[in-house]
């Protein structure tokens, strides 16, 4: 077996609509039906411009018993952050300001890389990487 990349990130939330709106407004992802909805679990797949579901959102409260031990917003222990390849640095900064989100910029000129660090509504740490942008 050989791993070719990360397929998606799954995020549990107690506020599905707020979280989906955050990923739509900031990252330009679009909502798609989550096939698990048929199993009674509410959620969305947040897709990139090519239709790839890269962030899965699950309403933790719609699945009693299944996710009871997980608490959005609490420390995630070993998983520190999720890094995403992005385009449109200036537009992203403008959207962050418009959304009144706290963020930090790291400019690694020697690597041709600019980064934005922030947290989503569930305290998931995000690293947005802009290469040559």
Regions found by a protein language model. Give the residues of each.
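Mid-chain, well-packed structural core segment of small domains
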Residues: 75, 81-89
């Amino acid at each position: 077996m050989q791993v070719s990349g990360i397929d998606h990130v799954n995020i549990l939330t107690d506020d599905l609509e707020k979280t989906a709106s955050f990923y739509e407004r900031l990252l330009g992802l679009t909502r798609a039906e989550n096939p698990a909805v048929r199993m009674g679990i509410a959620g969305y797949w947040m897709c990139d411009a090519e239709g790839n579901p890269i962030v899965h959102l699950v309403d933790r409260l719609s699945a009693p018993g299944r996710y009871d031990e997980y608490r959005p917003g609490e420390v995630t222990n070993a998983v520190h952050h999720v890094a995403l390849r992005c385009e449109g640095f200036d537009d992203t900064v403008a959207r962050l300001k418009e959304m009144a989100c706290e963020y930090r910029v790291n400019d690694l000129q020697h690597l041709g890389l600019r980064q934005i660090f922030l947290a989503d509504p569930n305290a998931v740490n995000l690293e947005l990487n802009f290469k040559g942008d």
